[in-house]
UniProtKB/Swiss-Prot annotation:
Organism annotation: Mus musculus
GO terms under biological process: amyloid fibril formation; amyloid-beta clearance by cellular catabolic process; apoptotic cell clearance; cell adhesion; cell surface receptor signaling pathway; cellular response to amyloid-beta; cellular response to bacterial lipopeptide; cellular response to diacyl bacterial lipopeptide
Transmembrane segments: 8-29, 440-461
S-S bridge residues: 243-311, 272-333, 313-322
Location of region: Required for interaction with thrombospondins, THBS1 and THBS2: 93-120
Name the record gives this protein: Platelet glycoprotein 4
Glycyl lysine isopeptide (Lys-Gly) (interchain with G-Cter in ubiquitin) cross-link site: 469, 472
Name of the gene encoding the protein in the UniProt record: Cd36
Length: 472
């Protein structure tokens, strides 16, 4: 009887030990299986989970616009006063709803090339008004004229055309005209062939972005989605030195197994440069743990604050010999037009940039850019891209509309908030197929290990106690 009991206790302890060992073994084996599955499914080729969502995003993406309506146009033009602005919006469009086109796999260098069609559909229910709402804004053509044509004689000719067309420093335009283009009366009088259509995003609809060529990750998963070339080149030809390099992905996804210490690099054709985001915090997105990476203030800092930015300063006068910060001159990739990009309301910009403008209220939470990345797959499940478009206008003695200006202005035209969040159905599917399975496996591993250890200890204690009792 005692032997049977002792044997039973030993058997229980052995079973506990086996369960504990099995649970311990399952941890690295399970992690290896998860890693193998993830590596297979994030490859950009037909049949994988990543490819299906990569070709056409399953997330609805909206682009909201706030327009800076100028309240004192005559006072500015006559007296070079501070520009008083009032933001109006949001006006919302649905974007990025078209699938990638001309998708071509290259098995030799393990890349896939494509173009991204552009399109925007107005969403009245998500907007404060209609596309016909009017705004008083800087006259884009008049402001750009002396910047592009600096010869005095040419400016005299342009001045006569500006006066003949009854154009001035400011103009009234509808939302639709301002964003997507309008026939400019001044440019229509220019006696040689030039584009007479002007708009902040003209041309956009029915155009494509690319050609992009990205690594598909089949031979090296650490390179998946990283851009190999853009428009057939590995550099942009806009910036000197390393600032001209195309780095990282397009921010829709990143190589898997993202760590908090990693700097996420990505290229944005909207701002004509590569940029980066750093870890900010952990958040829960519809039950999915994600890492929030944020665009740091350092990204638009002056070379004095961040020496790595020295090659983004290509102009010495407006930038006060490269000491100003928070704005980026992207004129070289906008056909020489004086276009400057910043964060909304000149967030993180130097005081000299925002001082001539009244009515701005920068707010970190409302105006910063962030990416919410699921760390195991590297998929971006939520994002907010926030940018402001500004135009430089300078005094021009030969152009009457600008001759009274006593200083240059970087004039805010609008700011945009492009957002996308994984839908509820997609989130549930993601949890079921990815995070749910990983969580379940982890629970099984810990349960086996925990139960095994408890069984082993309990049965061994009982065995020792029983043996001690029998010995007496």
């Amino acid at each position: 009887m005692g032997c049977d009991r002792n044997c039973g206790l030993i058997a229980g302890a052995v079973i506990g030990a086996v369960l504990a060992v099995f649970g311990g073994i399952l941890m690295p084996v399970g992690d290896m299986l998860i890693e193998k599955t993830i590596k297979r499914e994030v490859v950009l080729e037909e049949g994988t989970t990543a490819f299906k969502n990569w070709v056409k995003t399953g997330t609805t993406v909206y682009r909201q616009f706030w327009i800076f309506d100028v309240q004192n146009p005559d006072d500015v033009a006559k007296n070079s006063s501070k520009i008083k602005v009032k933001q109006r919006g949001p006006y919302t469009y649905r974007v990025r709803y078209l699938a990638k086109e001309n998708i071509t796999q290259d098995p030799e260098d393990h890349t896939v090339s494509f173009v991204q069609p552009n399109g925007a559909i107005f969403e009245p229910s998500l907007s404060v008004g209609t596309e016909d709402d009017n705004f008083t804004v800087l006259n884009l053509a008049v402001a750009a004229a002396p910047h592009i044509y600096q010869n005095s004689f040419v400016q005299v000719v342009l001045n006569s055309l500006i006066k003949k067309s009854k154009s001035s420093m400011f103009q009234t335009r509808s939302l639709k005209e301002l964003l997507w283009g309008y026939k400019d009366p001044f440019l229509s009088l220019v006696p040689y062939p030039i584009s007479t259509t002007v708009g902040v995003f003209y041309p956009y609809n029915d155009t494509v972005d690319g050609v992009y060529k990205v690594f598909n990750g089949k031979d090296n998963i650490s390179k998946v989605a990283i851009i190999e070339s853009y428009k057939g080149k590995r550099n942009l030809s806009y910036w000197p030195s390393y600032c001209d390099m195309i780095n990282g992905t397009d921010a829709a996804s990143f190589p898997p197994f993202v760590e908090k210490s990693r700097t996420l690099r990505f290229f944005s054709s909207d701002i004509c440069r590569s940029i980066y985001a750093v870890f900010g915090s952990e958040i829960d997105l519809k039950g999915i743990p994600v890492y929030r990476f944020v665009l740091p203030a350092n990204a638009f800092a002056s070379p004095l604050q961040n020496p790595d930015n020295h090659c983004f300063c290509t102009e010495k006068v407006i930038s006060n010999n490269c000491t100003s910060y928070g704005v980026l001159d992207i004129g070289k990739c906008k056909e020489g037009k004086p276009v400057y990009i910043s964060l909304p309301h000149f967030l993180h910009a130097s005081p000299d940039v925002s001082e001539p403008i009244e009515g701005l209220h920068p707010n970190e939470d409302e105006h910063r850019t962030y990416l919410d990345v699921e760390p195991i797959t590297g998929f971006t499940l939520q994002f907010a891209k926030r940018l402001q478009v500004n135009i430089l206008v300078k005094p021009a003695r030969k152009i009457e509309a600008l001759k009274n200006l006593k200083r240059p202005y970087i004039v805010p035209i609008l700011w945009l908030n492009e957002t996308g969040t994984i839908g509820d159905e997609k989130a549930e599917m993601f949890k079921t197929q990815v995070t749910g399975k990983i969580k379940l496996l982890g629970m099984v591993e810990m349960a086996l290990l925990g139960i095994g250890v408890v069984m082993f200890v309990a049965f061994m204690i009982s065995y020792c106690a029983c043996k001690s009792k029998n010995g007496k």
